[in-house]
Amino acid sequence: MSIAIKRAYEEPSDDDGYRVLVERLWPRGLKKEAVPLDQWAKELAPTTELRKWFGHDPALWDGFRHRYASELDGLAEYWQPLAERSVRHKVTLIYGAHDEEHNGALVLRDYLQHWLRTHGPA
């Protein structure tokens, strides 16, 4: 299983595999043609309400992780195909946040990896 995360502002690499933007909003200051993607999975991003509540405040990180995981619980139709793809092919979750330690892509990656370890692909 191979699920990586990468900032949208980083150079794409041949090693990225299947590139999926996991943000509801396009990353600021980037032209769409500058960010090669295989998929833009807006549905997998935290809700606007949760994103605004979190505001990238590290003090709210634990609460954000739990709330976002709860949102993901109801979105299997969107994340399960990515998890299953990652069993055979590398998937890179692309995110726009500047904070590399507190962002939704980290939570999503951990969520997918946990699901694969405990349930396995369908």
List the model feature ranges, each with a label:
Residues 1-122:
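Residues lining hydrophobic/aromatic ligand-binding pockets adjacent to catalytic sites
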